[in-house]
């Protein structure tokens, strides 16, 4: 037994829209069935398919008495089962927008008399028919042929009803059992297997009640022993929906009375209702079967989703069952009144949704657009029925008389609920008298039942109230019912007296019945079981009188929320989501907030999980973080990752929760599961910050995240050797990526090992060597050594030994002192370092790896010296110009050589400057001393001559020692410079590519290598560059000469005259050489680079070279004087050099001005003549000789119009034009041609295309010029 909650979710709807729908449906006669957004109306042999949106009606005349039908929306096929004589016929129609086609008509059964019910599968693949003990399956093939199979029951009981549920499950209902079969369709044949069965017997009910009694006693014993627990149960939250405090059973005595009352209730009902049929209905939305057994007054609920079976005890008899959406609709009859109850019975959800008092029973319920249309039975007062325009009743009679028996027509008028025949008005009076008599008896019984109900449920309800004992709802009965029952109670005695009279009158009426009526009564039971279960036999107009409408979804949510039925609200929303737009996530959020306030954090987090795609994650995270509920927060964050609704912050937060809970294993398992989803780089950073280095190492190595593995080895553990070995086991891409990231560190700590491994990779994978050049940018010496190992052809041990022996012999003969020995040891160290490199090189060439794993810092320093010696000591022969990246390799090699060359030149200049300063200081000191001695001690000159000589000898010795050191250093630097220049020149000369020439020019200009610049610029025919650098080179040479002259300024005054003469000679030679260079360049390059020449000639002191150059250019280039003035202005030169030219130019200008004045006077005279002609045109008359119109070519007649352009027109020819038409059209043509010409001139490509394609190009250009257009 269940306790039902009352939530009124329905209201009567009387709006205009619903009235329009009701009038539209009532205008068609027949039975109405809603299929999605369409109505199907059946009337005998006709089917009307009505589309309310477009008001399209398709009428199908089946020529059969329609028994059953089904419309499939996917293939748009309609299967109709109909009766023709004694056979069952299936016809298949294809429905389109406004037409239909009959695909096939098939005969299923020849004997139709015993068939109770037919079922059509929604997939339109098979049909099921029910006889008394036999179920027949008809499988429809694609060609609409039939394969037949049967299910025969051997028991004594007849089959009451059958239903076809989801997943091809067949439900067979008998009087005492319900059987569930699984249908299997294989090879166009239907087989079945029994899944389960449920007992509907009275003994089974009693056993279940006794079990409940024991369970209730145990609960009461526990509650009596533990009063605290009882109090706690009363104070529990209202989310436990299945138990309601106001209906709980309180005492053991009351429980015993309840169970005894139920037994008596069942015994009394079985005596009264032995012959009552079983009512049943199947709800497709819930996949639930409802069975009402009026013999026991029990409603069985079979949930086919989980095969759960439960029952509900009823108080009153159920007349009929209906199901729409997920609602169960029960129709009851009490005291001549009909009560309609709408329930939701699904799992633990037990709701009474609406109660309604009716004066007439309901034949069907239609659901459309969230409206429940109640079809109310009305007895036909007149035998004639008005038929709509789609159907002609008289023609139907003729067809049915030929096909059906006379008794079959009576079946059409039979009521499918009460099975009473409405024949005439006299029968109505007779049955009314009988019903009134029965009502009195029923009322008395109801009073006794009410008293028993009061004892069972301890409800303090008045004797005059109607008690719905079956569902324990006293509040749901309308006031109309109460009034009716109250009036019946007061008129009880009057009814008892009237019943006796009515009984006597009834006997008289029955005697006066005619023989024809008796014959009709005997024929009433002919074929009464045929198709009774299909409920398909009512044909009346204007049946829909009441329309119920569900309340607004917001109101429904508030109702559930007030009563705190959140779980039922969620179930209701899930059931109703296919019919209405409901925000289920919002409902879960409300329920979760409620649970969170009740401190039920675990249940709340599971409800918040349901709102993942709706609710912001920050809302939930903030709530749980404030209370430090990391355990529940981890559940929510894990679900975010399951539903793919997360970001990097969520993963970091989840990992931090694992860390705070010390769940290291769970953290590792989470990373392993979600490795493809999460950002591993950020997770590794988090783990590294947390100190889990070993975890990151293991994970990165396992999942082949090479970058993180190597980065940890290098940055945290500084294990370069292990990381190098790991890197060179990888593929080429990963090797390159990791070397570009950490290569500079490997070269710093393990240079020889890295170079060796790089060589192996380059040979193995055929990689170009230039890819790895960026690794050596911090150490140029090792870069050069790396390149030489691959490209130098001239590395030979014999040559190197020969060079070493020469150097040793040279230095041993030269030096004998200690200083000399120190320098020799330095050179020996350099030679030994060079030997180390060559040994390594020879070992690599022979295939023997060098043992470079245990090298120290000293060896690294030796390696660097070997690289330096390689640059300065060997004449290279490099194969640079063969690969794809030749430009890069050339740039690197030549840049290294040029850097070394620049450093050596800077060092040489510094040494020269220092030596010059020292010599100057010494000589000045000595001269000063000698002058002082000469002035003071002239008499002692002879005595001190010897001392002076000795001092001179000492100074000469010192000079000799210093000069020897200088000579040694100069020899070394000169050798180095010669080798470097040799290698640079060789690279430049071997070059034959223009692009490399351009790169070499840039590099040579950066490092001021003028010799190479002049060579490359002449090869490239870039004479401007050769001019600039040749002059620059000559200037540097002259500067060196001037410095030498300045060195001799400290000498006595006798030599100053010679120094001044040398300055003058240098100046003259300098000016002549620069002028000659400029003239030669002008001959080679022409007059394009005269700006450079002007610049250099303006720097000279003598202007005669500039005047010569200007005269030459003026002859060759025809430069104007204004251009010459601007050029001289740039370089701040005076105009005296072009004075004669300016005077000649001014004289020419005066002559031209005089000529122009004469031309101006002539033009003025011509203008005066033109003005006189215009005045004559204004004031003088014109002779018009035109006799014909210029348009129509007819003789002119008044009115006529003449123009000065000598065109004449009729006034009607011109109409409203005030302009000469012929001239105006010509002007238009000219304007269009000008516009085209402008457009074509703006499009230079088109202009030149037409110009090239034209035969006479001069005429083409002259046409454009004739339009008065010139390109801007």
Swiss-Prot record:
Q: Where is this region: Disordered?
A: 216-260, 842-862, 908-970
The UniProt entry lists membrane topology as:
Single-pass membrane protein
Q: State the Gene Ontology terms under molecular function.
A: protein-macromolecule adaptor activity; zinc ion binding
Q: Name one GO biological process term.
A: vacuole organization
Zinc finger (RING-type) stretch: 1189-1224
User: One cellular component GO annotation, for this chain's record?
Assistant: HOPS complex
**Start-end of Polar residues biased regions:** 957-967
Going by the UniProt record, its keywords in alphabetical order are: Coiled coil, Membrane, Merozoite, Metal-binding, Transmembrane, Transmembrane helix, Zinc, Zinc-finger
Q: Which InterPro entries match?
A: Clathrin_H-chain/VPS_repeat, VPS11_C, Znf_RING, Znf_RING/FYVE/PHD
The residue ranges crossing the membrane are 771-791
Low complexity: bias regions: 234-260, 850-861, 909-956
Domain of life the protein comes from? Eukaryota
The CHCR repeats lie at 608-752
Q: Where is the signal peptide?
A: none
Q: Which residues form a coiled coil?
A: 1146-1182
Q: How is it used?
A: Possible candidate for an effective malaria vaccine as determined by epitope response in sera.
Q: Where in or outside the cell?
A: Membrane
Q: What is this protein called?
A: RING finger protein PFE0100w
Lineage, opening ranks: Eukaryota, Sar, Alveolata, Apicomplexa, Aconoidasida
């Amino acid at each position: 037994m269940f306790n039902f909650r009352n939530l009124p979710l329905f209201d009567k709807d009387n709006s205009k829209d619903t009235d329009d729908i009701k009038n539209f449906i009532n205008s068609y006669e027949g039975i109405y069935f809603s299929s999605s957004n369409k109505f199907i109306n059946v009337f005998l042999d006709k089917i009307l398919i009505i589309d309310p949106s477009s008001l399209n009606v398709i009428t199908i005349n089946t020529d059969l008495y329609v028994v059953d039908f089904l419309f499939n929306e996917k293939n748009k096929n309609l299967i109709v089962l109909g009766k023709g004589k004694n056979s069952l016929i299936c016809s298949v129609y294809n429905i389109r927008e406004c037409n239909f086609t009959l695909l096939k008509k098939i005969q299923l059964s020849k004997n139709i008399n015993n068939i109770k019910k037919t079922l059509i599968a929604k997939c339109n693949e098979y049909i099921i028919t029910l006889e008394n003990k036999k179920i027949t399956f008809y499988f429809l093939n694609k060609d609409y042929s039939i394969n037949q199979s049967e299910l025969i029951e051997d028991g004594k009981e007849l089959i009451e009803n059958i239903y076809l549920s989801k997943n091809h499950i067949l439900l067979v209902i008998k009087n005492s059992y319900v059987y569930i079969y699984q249908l299997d369709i294989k090879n166009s044949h239907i087989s079945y297997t029994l899944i389960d069965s449920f007992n509907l017997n009275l003994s089974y009910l009693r056993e279940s009640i006794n079990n409940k009694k024991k369970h209730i006693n145990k609960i009461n014993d526990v509650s009596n022993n533990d009063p605290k627990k009882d109090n706690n149960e009363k104070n529990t939250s209202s989310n436990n929906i299945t138990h309601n405090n106001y209906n709980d059973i309180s005492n053991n005595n009351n429980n015993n009375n309840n169970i005894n009352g139920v037994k008596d209730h069942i015994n009394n009902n079985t005596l009264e209702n032995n012959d009552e049929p079983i009512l049943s209905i199947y709800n497709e939305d819930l996949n639930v079967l409802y069975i009402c057994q009026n013999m026991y007054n029990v409603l069985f609920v079979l949930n086919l989703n989980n095969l759960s079976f439960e029952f509900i005890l009823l108080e009153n008899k159920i007349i009929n069952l209906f199901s729409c959406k997920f609602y169960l609709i029960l129709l009851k009859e009490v005291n001549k009144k009909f009560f309609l109850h709408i329930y939701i019975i699904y799992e633990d959800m037990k709701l009474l949704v609406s109660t309604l008092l009716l004066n007439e029973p309901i034949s069907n319920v239609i659901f459309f657009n969230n409206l429940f249309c109640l079809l109310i039975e009305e007895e036909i007062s007149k035998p004639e029925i008005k038929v709509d325009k789609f159907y002609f009743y008289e023609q139907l009679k003729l067809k049915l008389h030929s096909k059906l028996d006379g008794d079959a027509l009576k079946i059409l008028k039979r009521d499918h609920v009460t099975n009473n025949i409405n024949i005439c008005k006299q029968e109505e009076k007779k049955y009314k008298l009988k019903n009134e008599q029965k009502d009195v008896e029923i009322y008395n019984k109801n009073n006794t039942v009410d008293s028993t109900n009061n004892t069972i449920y301890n409800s303090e309800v008045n004797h005059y109230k109607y008690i719905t004992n079956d569902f324990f709802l006293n509040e749901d009965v309308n006031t109309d019912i109460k009034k009716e029952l109250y009036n019946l109670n007061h008129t009880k005695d009057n009814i008892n007296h009237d019943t006796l009279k009515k009984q006597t009158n009834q006997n008289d009426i029955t005697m006066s019945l005619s023989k024809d009526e008796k014959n009709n009564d005997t024929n009433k039971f002919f074929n009464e079981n045929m198709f009774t279960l299909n409920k398909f036999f009512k044909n009346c107009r204007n049946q829909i009188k009441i329309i119920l409408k569900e309340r607004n979804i917001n109101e429904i949510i508030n109702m559930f929320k007030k009563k705190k039925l959140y779980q039922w609200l969620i179930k209701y929303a899930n059931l109703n989501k296919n019919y209405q737009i409901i925000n289920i996530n919002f409902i879960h959020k409300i329920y979760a907030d409620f649970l969170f306030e009740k401190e039920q954090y675990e249940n709340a987090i599971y409800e918040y999980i349901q709102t993942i795609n709706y609710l912001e994650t920050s809302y939930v995270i903030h709530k749980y973080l404030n209370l430090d509920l990391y355990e529940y927060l981890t559940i929510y964050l894990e679900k975010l990752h399951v539903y793919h609704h997360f970001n990097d912050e969520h993963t970091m937060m989840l990992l931090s929760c694992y860390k705070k809970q010390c769940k290291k294993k769970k953290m590792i398992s989470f990373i392993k599961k979600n490795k493809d989803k999460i950002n591993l780089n950020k997770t590794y950073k988090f783990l590294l910050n947390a100190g889990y280095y070993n975890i990151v190492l293991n994970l990165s190595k396992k999942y082949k995240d090479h970058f993180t593995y190597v980065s940890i080895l290098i940055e945290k553990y500084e294990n370069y050797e292990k990381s190098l070995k790991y890197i060179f086991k990888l593929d080429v891409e990963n090797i390159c990526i990791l070397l570009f990231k950490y290569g500079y560190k490997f070269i710093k700590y393990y240079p020889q090992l890295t170079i060796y491994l790089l060589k192996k990779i380059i040979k193995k994978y055929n990689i170009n060597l230039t890819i790895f050049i960026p690794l050596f940018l911090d150490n140029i010496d090792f870069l050069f050594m790396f390149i030489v190992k691959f490209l130098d052809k001239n590395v030979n041990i014999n040559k190197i030994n020969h060079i070493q022996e020469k150097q040793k012999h040279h230095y041993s003969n030269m030096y004998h002192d200690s200083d000399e020995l120190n320098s020799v040891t330095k050179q020996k160290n350099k030679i030994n370092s060079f030997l180390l490199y060559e040994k390594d090189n020879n070992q690599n060439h022979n295939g023997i790896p060098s043992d470079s794993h245990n090298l120290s810092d000293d060896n690294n320093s030796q390696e660097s010296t070997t690289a330096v010696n390689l640059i300065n000591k060997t004449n290279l022969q490099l194969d640079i110009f063969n690969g794809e990246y030749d430009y890069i390799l050339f740039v690197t090699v030549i840049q290294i050589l040029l850097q070394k060359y620049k450093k050596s030149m800077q060092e040489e200049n510094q040494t020269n400057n220092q030596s010059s300063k020292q010599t100057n200081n010494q000589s000045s000191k000595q001269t000063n001393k000698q002058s002082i001695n000469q002035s003071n001690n002239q008499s002692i000159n002879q005595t001190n001559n010897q001392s002076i000589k000795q001092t001179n000898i000492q100074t000469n010795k010192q000079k000799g020692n210093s000069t020897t050191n200088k000579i040694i250093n100069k020899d070394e630097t000169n050798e180095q410079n010669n080798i470097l220049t040799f290698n640079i020149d060789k690279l430049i000369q071997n070059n034959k590519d223009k692009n490399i020439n351009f790169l070499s020019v840039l590099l040579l200009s950066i490092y001021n290598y003028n010799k190479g610049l002049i060579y490359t610029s002449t090869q490239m025919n870039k004479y401007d560059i050769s001019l600039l650098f040749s002059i620059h080179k000559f200037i540097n040479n002259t500067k060196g000469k001037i410095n030498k002259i300045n060195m001799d300024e400290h000498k006595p005054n006798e030599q100053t005259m010679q120094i001044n003469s040398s300055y003058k000679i240098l100046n003259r030679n300098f000016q002549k050489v620069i002028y000659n260079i400029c003239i030669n360049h002008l001959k080679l390059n022409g007059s394009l680079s005269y700006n450079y020449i002007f610049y250099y000639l303006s720097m000279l002191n003598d202007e005669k070279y500039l005047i010569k150059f200007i005269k030459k250019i003026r002859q060759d280039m025809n430069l104007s004087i204004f251009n010459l003035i601007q050029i001289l202005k740039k370089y701040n030169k005076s105009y005296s050099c072009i004075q004669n030219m300016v005077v000649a130019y001014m004289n020419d200008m005066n002559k031209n001005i005089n000529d122009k004045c004469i031309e101006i006077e002539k033009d003025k005279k011509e203008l005066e003549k033109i003005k006189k002609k215009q005045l004559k045109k204004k004031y003088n008359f014109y002779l018009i000789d035109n006799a014909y119109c210029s348009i129509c070519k007819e003789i002119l007649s008044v009115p006529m119009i003449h123009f000065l352009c000598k065109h004449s027109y009729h006034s009607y020819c011109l109409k409203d034009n005030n302009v000469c038409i012929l001239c105006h059209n010509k002007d238009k043509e000219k304007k269009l041609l000008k516009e085209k010409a402008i457009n074509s001139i703006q499009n230079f490509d088109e202009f030149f295309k037409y110009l090239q394609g034209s035969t006479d190009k001069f005429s083409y250009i002259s046409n454009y010029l004739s339009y008065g257009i010139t390109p801007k």
